[in-house]
Amino acid sequence: SEDWIVLVDECHRTQEKDLGAFLSATLPNARFFGFTGTPIKKADKDTYARFSEPGETYLDKYGIDDAVRDKATVPILYEGRKTDWSINEAEIDILFDRWFVDVPDDKREKLRKKGVSLAVIAKHPGRIRLIALDIWEHFKQVCRPDKYKAQIVAIDRESIVLYRTALRDVVAADLMKDGMAEAEAVAKAGRMIACVFSKSQEDNKPSEDADIADLRAELEAHFLDDEGEKAAKKAFKGGGDEPSFLIVCDKLLTGFDSPNEHVMYLDKPLREHGLL
């Protein structure tokens, strides 16, 4: 019946695959209206083609400028942080040979066999340490004076725990310069950082590979279940500095409302609906 009107929220996510096909087949004559802040236009996923009349795009548009004007959101400002460890995706093999020259031969070959990828390059320990230091120095200048907080977006779950360790060490070293005892500084720095990521079925499995076993142990140590994640997000939105940072890779990138979050440090390519 054409009397049916279907309102689809977050329509870029649900209507291209089975759910959308079943819904259209069930209500073939219904009028569909889609709502999204991040429409997608790709060969295999086209929000405009799914919901718009031929040759049209939006029926109505309420953009970021409108939301800022109405004070529904705040302006988004982008600042590039170029370093010697910036990654050009076209030169991944060259960067691998240059950056991993001091890594033991067996470990370097193991990485090469897995495939030299953007993620492998991004997780170089020296690169992570340098960026963690840059994040902390920037955070002290921009966020800390006004008790603002920040997210760090890493490329994957492994890089989350790598960033946590590097940032904890940087913060602890700074606290020790201010006279705090080492054990207290390390503990305090650890409490200033929370990691939010999804669990994998592989996390609890033993491995004969020492690197994989260590990674799984780190992921297990810093994983937050549903209650732990709720508590971390509540504390993050609160006034204290524990935590001051949320480190994520996929979660909390969109739809997470925290007025005291001032900066999102991006070390992951984000595109289309993953960006806003």
What are the functions of these language-model segments?
Residues 1-33:
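SF2 helicase catalytic motif II
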Residues 2-3, 27-31, 59, 70-76, ...:
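Short glycine-/polar-rich loops that comprise or flank the Walker A/P-loop
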Residues 12-13, 37-42, 69, 82-86, ...:
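Conserved nucleotide-binding/hydrolysis micro-motifs of P-loop NTPases
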Residues 21-23, 46-53, 93-94, 166-171, ...:
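Short secondary-structure boundary/capping segments
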Residues 45-148, 163-169, 175-178:
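Interdomain helical connector at the RecA1-RecA2 junction of SF1/SF2 helicase-like NTPases
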Residues 246-248, 253-269, 275:
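A short beta-strand element within the Helicase C-terminal
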